[in-house]
Amino acid sequence: FQAEDGIRDQPRSRGLGDVYKRQDLELYLKSSFFSDVALSPDGKHLAFQSKSDEFTEGLLVARTDDFLDPKKGLEKATVAKAALENSGDDVLRVKELFLCRFNWVSNSLILVEICGKNFDRLRGEIFTALGVFKLFNIETKEFKNFLYPLEPAPKKGSMTFADRYRPATFISKYDDESILMSVAENKRGFRYAHLRRVFFDKRGVKPNGTDLYVSKQPCQFKVGYKANSACNIPYIFILDKDKKPALTFSSDLDGVYAHYADDKTTKIDIDLEDYTPFAIKDDLLWMYGVSGIGAHNVSLLNLKTKKIQKAVPSDCHSVISAMNSLNEATPYAIDMECDGKKEIIYFDQEKRDAQILSQLAPSFPDKNISLGNWTDKNDKAIFSVSDSSVVSEFFMLDLTKGTLIPIGRTSNVPKDKLHKMVSKKFKTRDGETIYGFLTLPKGEVKRLIVYIHGGPYGIRDYDQYDFSEQYLASKGAAVLKVNYRGSGGYGKNFMEDAYKEWGGTLLNDIADATIAVQKELGIGRSQTCAFGASYGGYAALGMAYKHSDLYECVAGGMGVYDMKILRDGSDESIYTYQDDYEETAEKFWGDDQAQLVDFSPVFNADKMNSRILMWHGLQDPISPIVHLELMKEALDKNNVPYQAFTMSKLGHTFGEKEDIKAHLPVLKDFLFDEL
């Protein structure tokens, strides 16, 4: 990286101590051995999704009994491996492929979905479900291409791209010979969802099979010359208990609608844009309420009365996981946060699985809990717990033996090196309730560091592993994360009421939580710093003049510092090229010029009284480098000391491991006033 100082001296040279710092950081950056595990329908095999420093990305399948036998272990238990090359796909214009999901579809076959990672000039870094699937046979070891969405161009005649492109979406396992997929077929310029039974022994990579239902309502609509597609949403078809289509969905300019899977694809005229449907039982459609990245409640739509009713207590928010019994789509329990605390909400406490869960859960307090993946005999399942202090830990529940057997932890970091995020509840200055997390070091609290999440709208912090947080806590920092107003997972009003409040309500919420924790820990301004990236970088610099009485130092990465050029689009962020940029900008930031100046760090440099560090990627397309340049000019003009560095290859991200090992120790030293 390139270091730049405004007025301050150059950072001191680095010696042997820095080597140890990098070694400590290496521990927290080490990739997990596996990220997910699934039990085969007969329970005889475990499939691990792997992408670690030791193993190539792909699947590793082991015999269950041998794997759980301490005398044999993984090496002797392994029966099959499938590796995925991370190269891109030029035809689909994807720069990188990765394994995003997998499902056991028989005792010997695993369906693997391949997704794409790309960079779009208009949308930035995007992760895309491509409709690419591979089939892994653990007996023959064949890892073959199963579905590919784009047919080759015909040798004679012509065929439009729309006619050639037929993406498929996995809906459900059907039987030992086939699965159910939704295939979007083009007809007269529109796409229609086909619920199709696709057989494993089919030839080629076309999504050929037997149609069980064809929607008469297009799942794609046009606005001008552009088309919007709802064809590949995971819930495009919802099945009944017999795996027959019950509902399908469509969208238009006004909303998202359910349709009965009848002869006419009859529309249910209720806008479901704020919901994600996921199951149906009798006349009740089960749905998650969606705000940003988080589902914030569970609601039921009565298909007869057309009324929607919440199914969980009013103080519950932020769905963590749903628990389902074998072959049932409706959950018997939901793991949620209620008033900021983890809690399991039971819908049917008489069910066997609910009683099992109620016996297991108390042994894992304040953990994110999941129970599912039952075998066909309904006697074995996967039980998992996760949070910041264990990362993820998997167990096999064996009812015939009455045992809960550890499978493994996903993390390579020893538990004694991990720190627990404790949920917190705060009252704001205007009487609202907000939530957050406080992570304490194992020894003396040397600093309070407020780690501000990005977004800001729709994003939120969870009790989960974060290498930056764990690294800072290992050095003696108490780390505070605040889900200020505007964060996702707490409801649409909680998010949208914070629009046009970047430098107002949002910063006040963070400040109010900071004051509460300072009092709790007996810590003052001299030991308190704030940092973040993206919106968090903006907020950190905003704290230097809005709430400088609370923060001795602030560190902002990849931040937007001039809201006037953000608002009018002259910073040339990738988002300014979108057709609806003006509409979005008005909604998020408004047109009050005085407020835009008040909320912009570049126009308030003379009021900044905290130590300042900034870092930025020269390739950042979302918060262009002009924001850092303008901020430095403003600080220089007002003789305000600061430190800054840029990284030549970095975009709007912390980067790869080597990038993080370069800049995170610098950030740590600054926050601890050791730079």
Predicted region positions:
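Conserved beta-strand segments of alpha/beta enzyme cores
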Residues: T403, A478, P641-Q643
